[in-house]
């Protein structure tokens, strides 16, 4: 199961953080590190701070975009503070661990961490099914990147061990669509709404953001998503006649 957990770092600017994250991952049994457009490439400092987890660094997958890192994933959780202009379904770290361990039994799960200074952008966060916030001391809530990864990775491991102890079934088929399929649905929905005049090109972003939030909250299963796409195709066909 742990092999299905991806730790995704977006535009990391310090190689030392890559090494410290690798160490945090390996102590919890995680090995899949994805680096999205890193501002620096892993170097000797990253290897030194990995402290025995250099294999995690050496096997890291470097990609140009977040979409590439999320390809094939069934669940995506992004780290975020709670104060956002567009509210999103939130998880506590323990809930994040439980849900990640459950869904990683049948498909890859991505846990996404943002830039050291500014975190994830709103556009990046909208690609996530859930956001997770670490309830740190409000008077001093500063966590470095490796600390945040360690906390979330620990919760995933504990949830995984609990599932093993309880004898939970492994490798069950997921009812939920992959991230790629959801993105195709959103593109289809946007095309249909533009075609029917429900939204206009100058103002499509605000409506689509709210619709993304709606479907993220509802989280339709794969068969339900196919029904929705069938409805959209029917609307487009009728509109063209």
Swiss-Prot record:
Keyword S-adenosyl-L-methionine among UniProt keywords: yes
Keywords, alphabetical: Cytoplasm, Methyltransferase, S-adenosyl-L-methionine, Transferase, tRNA processing
GO molecular function terms attached to this record: RNA binding; tRNA (cytidine(32)/uridine(32)-2'-O)-methyltransferase activity
Record: residues binding S-adenosyl-L-methionine: 79-81, 114, 134, 141-143
Cellular component, GO annotation: cytosol
The keyword tRNA processing is assigned to this record: yes
Subcellular location: Cytoplasm
Any Pfam family matching the protein: SpoU_methylase
Biological processes annotated in GO: tRNA nucleoside ribose methylation
Catalytic activity: cytidine(32) in tRNA + S-adenosyl-L-methionine = 2'-O-methylcytidine(32) in tRNA + S-adenosyl-L-homocysteine + H(+); uridine(32) in tRNA + S-adenosyl-L-methionine = 2'-O-methyluridine(32) in tRNA + S-adenosyl-L-homocysteine + H(+)
Coiled coil: none
Major place of residence: cytoplasm
Entry EC no(s): 2.1.1.200
NCBIfam families noted in UniProt: PRK15114.1, rRNA_methyl_1
Subunit relationships: Homodimer.
Summary of the function given for this chain in its UniProt record: Catalyzes the formation of 2'O-methylated cytidine (Cm32) or 2'O-methylated uridine (Um32) at position 32 in tRNA.
Assigned protein family: Belongs to the class IV-like SAM-binding methyltransferase superfamily. RNA methyltransferase TrmH family.
PANTHER family reported for this sequence: TRNA (CYTIDINE_URIDINE-2'-O-)-METHYLTRANSFERASE TRMJ, TRNA/RRNA METHYLTRANSFERASE
Protein name as it appears in the record: tRNA (cytidine/uridine-2'-O-)-methyltransferase TrmJ
Organism in which the protein naturally occurs: Pectobacterium atrosepticum (strain SCRI 1043 / ATCC BAA-672)
Gene: trmJ
């Amino acid at each position: 199961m742990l092999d299905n957990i991806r730790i995704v770092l977006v535009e990391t600017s310090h190689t030392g953080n890559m090494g410290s994250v690798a160490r945090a991952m390996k102590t919890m049994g995680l090995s899949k590190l994805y680096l999205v457009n890193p501002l620096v490439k892993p170097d000797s400092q990253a290897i030194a701070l990995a402290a025995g987890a250099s294999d995690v660094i050496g096997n890291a997958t470097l990609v140009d975009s977040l979409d590439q890192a999320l390809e094939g994933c069934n669940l995506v959780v992004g780290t975020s503070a709670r104060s956002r202009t567009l509210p999103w379904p939130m998880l506590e770290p323990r809930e994040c661990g439980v849900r990640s361990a459950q869904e990683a039994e049948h498909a890859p799960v991505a846990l996404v961490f943002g830039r050291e200074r500014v975190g994830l952008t709103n556009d990046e966060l909208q690609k996530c099914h859930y956001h997770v916030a670490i309830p740190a001391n409000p008077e001093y809530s500063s966590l470095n990147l490796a600390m945040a990864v360690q906390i979330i990775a620990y919760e995933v491991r504990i949830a995984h061990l609990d599932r093993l102890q309880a004898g939970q079934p492994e490798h069950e088929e997921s009812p939920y669509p992959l991230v790629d399929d959801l993105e195709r649905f959103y593109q289809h929905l946007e095309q249909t709404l533009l075609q029917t005049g429900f939204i206009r090109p100058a103002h499509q972003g605000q409506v689509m953001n709210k619709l993304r939030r709606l479907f993220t909250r509802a989280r339709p299963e794969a068969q339900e998503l196919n029904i929705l796409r069938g409805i959209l195709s029917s609307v487009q066909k009728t509109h063209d006649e």
